[in-house]
Each structure stands twice: as structure tokens, then as C-alpha cells.
């Protein structure tokens, strides 16, 4: 059954997520698979009973949210297909950027006696009862720590150029070899002062195994798997014990490995870490 879409929004609402995954791990994984579509301002995840299996991803650009929704709809994430739709209202962070943010006194509204409700008020409340999710987009989720406590990988990246997709571009669910996933940072989009990873000085001959360097401390096997498993032929990620900054990614053949290397070369996992990819030595 198709998921009904509302008006395009900077924020996408995701449900049917695996409830057994820890909150911090879920945030990192969501960032890993959605950052390819554009700049992420925030990710909201709560472990409260009411909000389990749900999350909100807030993009800087509406076009990024649209591409993410259409490309990742039904994507198997922790063995469950994601259900994605636009959030029904702007999140607080977007409302503040637009200048439309209105502070809400939640405590006072909560204590409001029922006897003061007029028939018109009751009707309005009942009419909005079908969309309990909206409140979570508009402000902090109850029981959730402030986003300042989120992993560093989730933070807004000042100065990073936002992803601007070509007009009318809608990425397909699967990527053919050689296609660049939307939002993957090409070398020319690195931060000022950083040298673009043009052509390595000593390029190894093609190999079905890729060698990754300049990875941030937060990197784990799952995050890299989420990035690379969108490419045909992906087999596995291998980390090096005692080294968080390097990893190996194996594909079925050299052509498939080369397509993934070209697409994700220079991908910025964090503000200061542009991933460098080369063929592993044989």
C-alpha cells in the first residue's frame, strides 16, 4: 500500500524502524544512509514507548528531503522496510530559519482544565487527533535528550555547501555502476583549504577490494555498509583492529568496486573527514 504524501517539507518522517536498535546507533545509521541526499540539520529519535520505531530527518533543502523520500521508500533497514513521508509541519529549526517560529508553552497547555474547553475548541482538537506525529516535529520529543548530546557526526556542518540536485532529478531506487548517489561529495566540494583528492600519486591497479582512509573516530562497520551496499556487487566491510581511520570494502569484481570508489571519493562523513578511497594492493 502506497504511503500518502503531504506537502513537500524539509523534514521527513520515518516509521517501521527496528525497535531493538539503540538510539545512538540508529542516529548514526540514519545519518550514514541519508547524508548522501544533502545537508542534514538534525535527526530526532526517541526511545519513549510512544515514539519507538520512528524518526525524523531534517534537511536544509526541500529537494534533498524529496530525493531521500523517493529513493529510500521501502529500503530494507535493519531487516525492516522503511516507510517514509513528509512531516506535516515545519520543524522548529526550519521555522526559526524562516522566521515563522512561535514559542509554545506546553506546560500551561497541559494544565488547562477541560471545563474551559468550548464546543469549537473540542471540535478543533478532535479534528487534529489524527496526526499525533506532528507535535514531535515541532519541538523536542518528550523524554529525549537535547540534540547537543547527539554524536558529533550528527551535528550541522558549518560552511559545507548544500547539495543542489540538477533540475528535475529524481534518483532511482537502485544505482547502476558509475552513477553518483545524490549528494555524494565530489572532490571539488571539499572545505576551503583542503586539497581535493584528484588522482592519487601512486594508484594501485584495479582490485575488487577498496582501501578507505581518513575515516573519523565514529566510524563503524554498519555505517560503512549502509554507504556502500547501495552499489551492485557489495559483499562486506572489514575494519582493522586498533585503527578507526582505515577500512576495507569488498565487491564481487573490479568494475563494481571502481564504480563505488568513483561515486564516494571525497564523501564527507564529518566536517573534517573527507573519505579517501583507493584500490587495495594485491
From Swiss-Prot:
Gene Ontology molecular function, alphabetical: DNA binding; identical protein binding; RNA binding; U1 snRNA binding; U1 snRNP binding
Compartments it resides in: Nucleus
Source domain of life: Eukaryota
Annotated positions of the N-acetylalanine modification: 2
Keyword terms: Acetylation, Methylation, mRNA processing, mRNA splicing, Nucleus, Phosphoprotein, Repeat, Ribonucleoprotein, RNA-binding, Spliceosome
Main location: nucleus
GO BP, sorted A to Z: mRNA splicing, via spliceosome
Domain RRM: from-to ranges: 10-89, 208-282
Any Pfam family: RRM_1
Family statement: Belongs to the RRM U1 A/B'' family.
Quaternary structure and interacting proteins, as annotated: U1 snRNP is composed of the 7 core Sm proteins SNRPB, SNRPD1, SNRPD2, SNRPD3, SNRPE, SNRPF and SNRPG that assemble in a heptameric protein ring on the Sm site of the small nuclear RNA to form the core snRNP, and at least three U1 snRNP-specific proteins SNRNP70/U1-70K, SNRPA/U1-A and SNRPC/U1-C. Interacts with SFPQ; component of a snRNP-free complex with SFPQ. Interacts with IVNS1ABP (via BACK domain); the interaction is indirect.
Protein name per Swiss-Prot or TrEMBL: U1 small nuclear ribonucleoprotein A
Gene: SNRPA
Amino acid at each position: 500500500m502506497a504511503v500518502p504524501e503531504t506537502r513537500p517539507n524539509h523534514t521527513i518522517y520515518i516509521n517501521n524502524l527496528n525497535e531493538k536498535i539503540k538510539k545512538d546507533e540508529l542516529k548514526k545509521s540514519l545519518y550514514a544512509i541519508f547524508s548522501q541526499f544533502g545537508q542534514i540539520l538534525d535527526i530526532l529519535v526517541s526511545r519513549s514507548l510512544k515514539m519507538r520505531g520512528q524518526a525524523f530527518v531534517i534537511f536544509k533543502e526541500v529537494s534533498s528531503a524529496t530525493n531521500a523520500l523517493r529513493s529510500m521508500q521501502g529500503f530494507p533497514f535493519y531487516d525492516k522496510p522503511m516507510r517514509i513521508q513528509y512531516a506535516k509541519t515545519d520543524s522548529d529549526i526550519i521555522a526559526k530559519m524562516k522566521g515563522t517560529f512561535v514559542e509554545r508553552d506546553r506546560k500551561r497547555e497541559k494544565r488547562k482544565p477541560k471545563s474551559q474547553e468550548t464546543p469549537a475548541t473540542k471540535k478543533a482538537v478532535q479534528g487534529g487527533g489524527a496526526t499525533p506525529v506532528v507535535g514531535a516535529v515541532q519541538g523536542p520529543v518528550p523524554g529525549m535528550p537535547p540534540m547537543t548530546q547527539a554524536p558529533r557526526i550528527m551535528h550541522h556542518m558549518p560552511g559545507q555547501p548544500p547539495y543542489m540536485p540538477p533540475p528535475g532529478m529524481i534518483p532511482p531506487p537502485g544505482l547502476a555502476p558509475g552513477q553518483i548517489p545524490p549528494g555524494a561529495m565530489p572532490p571539488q566540494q571539499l572545505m576551503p583549504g583542503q586539497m581535493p583528492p584528484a588522482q592519487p600519486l601512486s594508484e594501485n591497479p584495479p582490485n575488487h577490494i577498496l582501501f578507505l582512509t581518513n575515516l573519523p573516530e565514529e566510524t563503524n562497520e554498519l555505517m560503512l555498509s549502509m554507504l556502500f551496499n547501495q552499489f551492485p556487487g557489495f559483499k562486506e566491510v572489514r575494519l582493522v583492529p586498533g585503527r578507526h581511520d582505515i577500512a576495507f570494502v569488498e565487491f564481487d569484481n573490479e568494475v563494481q568496486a571502481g564504480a563505488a570508489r568513483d561515486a564516494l571519493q571525497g564523501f564527507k562523513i564529518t566536517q573534517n573527514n573527507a573519505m579517501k578511497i583507493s584500490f587495495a594492493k594485491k
